[in-house]
């Protein structure tokens, strides 16, 4: 779900409208951007974590309980401690995975997120080698590896990353 608008209300309401449309079209899963702050904040928005939670709650309510919801916060927080202050309370939203809560090179934070967050953790879209993925999977303990075929060395390397993920009981989803 890709938002539009230049205010918090427009942003939230556009994501709710997209969620309702996805539901009406019979989608079984959706990934929603929720970028109200951080390096990739939508239209320069600068909202607090309570507002981020408000958007997640509104999208989940619009989708209902039977559609998988994935949330991409695009490096919203500086570390796991900061992220967990918010996402520990998101269990009620039944999020399938949380994408890129912190910068991908913060392996320690990813491991902590895996251990303490109430949802799967996904990352990897900017990684360029299978060796980086191996580190993120083994030491960062991510649940979902997300290679971007155009960055990770092509389809052959993406397949190797997928195989490594599978061998380590992790999911691998091509990043879109």
What are these language model-derived features?
Residues 2-111, 116:
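Metal-dependent enolase-superfamily TIM-barrel catalytic cores that perform enediolate-based chemistry
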Residues 26, 88-96, 114-122, 137-146, ...:
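Glycine-enriched alpha-helix->loop->beta-strand junction motifs that scaffold or abut catalytic
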Residues 71-77, 103-104, 123-130, 153-155:
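Glycine-rich beta-to-alpha transition loops that act as phosphate-gripper elements at the mouths
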Residues 109, 131-132, 157:
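Short acidic active-site motifs
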């Amino acid at each position: 779900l890709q938002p539009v608008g230049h205010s918090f209300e427009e942003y939230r309401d556009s994501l709710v409208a997209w969620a309702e449309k996805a539901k009406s079209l019979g989608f079984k899963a959706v990934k929603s951007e929720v970028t109200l702050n951080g390096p990739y904040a939508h239209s320069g928005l600068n909202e607090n974590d309570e507002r981020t939670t408000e958007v997640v709650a509104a999208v989940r309510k619009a989708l209902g309980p039977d559609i998988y919801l994935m949330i991409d916060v695009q490096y919203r927080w500086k570390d796991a401690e900061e992220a967990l202050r918010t996402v520990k309370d998101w269990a009620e939203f039944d999020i399938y995975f949380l994408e890129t809560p912190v910068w991908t090179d913060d392996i320690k934070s990813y491991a902590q997120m895996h251990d303490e967050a109430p949802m799967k953790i996904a990352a990897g879209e900017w990684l360029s080698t299978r060796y980086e993925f191996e580190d993120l999977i083994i030491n960062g303990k991510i649940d979902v590896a997300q290679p971007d075929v155009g960055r990770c060395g092509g389809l052959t390397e993406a397949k190797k990353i997928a195989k490594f993920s599978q061998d380590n009981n992790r999911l691998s989803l091509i990043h879109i």
